[in-house]
């Protein structure tokens, strides 16, 4: 009887995990033989444990059935087996845990190593998707470890031990992620570029090269890089920035040009004189729209005395003599106006005598001078005091244009004489007509000109179309 009870206890410890053992264990005292046979059958196949059984029913079976067994055995035979049973179950649990621990630890360690290798070198870690993939991987690994613990362990102690082990593995993953983050931060610091500090010699050499050629070829860039001890990429970027700067300067300075070329010339000339422009500027159109800018008293006195041919520059800050031949070759929209710069005496003396503000006296004087000039041109002889014909476009007009100019000048003279109301304007006009000379060899400065009245400009002789075609319009 004792032998049978001992066998039943051993079979109970071995075959408790089968589903049928729990059902038949309550009828152990009634049908001992059947229980022994079924327990023997179950003991022959201990590996039929279903790995997908949840841990709670197993734990319940482990917690409830030994209580029944203890109660029945103690009541029947008065044997104290709880200590032995607990020691046996703890031995089994410890053996199972020791058998499962190394494998799970190696898997977790391998997973941590793999994740650390991947996350440190992968660029996905820097993106939000990579950061979201790390918790997903951790959750997957946790589920895998929990399923393994359910399949391989029979006590809650082993499950908690593996949970703590996996927690350590998760800590390893987080540590690897932190390491990868620090590595990416250091790489970003290394990629950051700082501004290149050019020396004065380097800037001077680059500016000189830019004046010579805005676009530099690659061989030339290589030569400059070797000469200036700079990377080729730096020189390329410098030339790109320099071209953009030049474009901005030209756009900023060219805003008055379509409406007023004179103001554009004035601004650009003064900018070149003050050193604001890095490139030389050649003034093409003289300054005739702004009489109040820099007109000197010396020029006014010289004009009043009638010495218009020898008058000095009317601008206080004269930059350079304005080349009238270059001005004539400039594609200006009204080339007939450029004749006035070859004949400053036509408008200079009467305007100065009238105080630079009397439009009537200026118109009268201009009418008289224009009448004299047109009559001389109609007679086929050069004007008085001139040894060679003028090179301006208006002086090379045809006979029809000269006749039209004479008619316009006569009409303008009658209108100007009525407006003057006195003989002073007429006297000044005759003086201006006598002083008028259409010679390029006259002893005067090339930049000696004064502004003229808009009424005179509107009545000036106009070149025929064939003459005007020589100066194309480039607006």
UniProtKB/Swiss-Prot annotation:
* Superkingdom of origin organism: Eukaryota
Its cellular-component GO annotations read: nucleus
Q: Where is the composition biased (Low complexity)?
A: 83-96
Q: Does the keyword DNA-binding apply?
A: yes
Q: Which GO terms describe its molecular function?
A: DNA-binding transcription factor activity, RNA polymerase II-specific; sequence-specific double-stranded DNA binding
Region annotated Disordered sits at 82-113, 155-189
- Asked if the keyword Nucleus belongs to this entry, the reply reads yes
- DNA-binding region positions on the chain: 191-250
Alphabetized, the UniProt keywords read: Developmental protein, DNA-binding, Homeobox, Nucleus
- Composition-biased stretches (Gly residues): 160-186
A single BP term in Gene Ontology: limb morphogenesis
Tell me the Pfam families matching this sequence. Homeodomain
Give the UniProt subcellular location, in the record's own words.
Nucleus
PANTHER family (alphabetical):
HOMEOBOX EVEN-SKIPPED HOMOLOG PROTEIN 2 (PTHR46294:SF1), SEGMENTATION PROTEIN EVEN-SKIPPED (PTHR46294)
What is the similarity comment for this entry? Answer: Belongs to the even-skipped homeobox family.
Protein name stated in the entry? Homeobox even-skipped homolog protein 2
Originating organism: Mus musculus
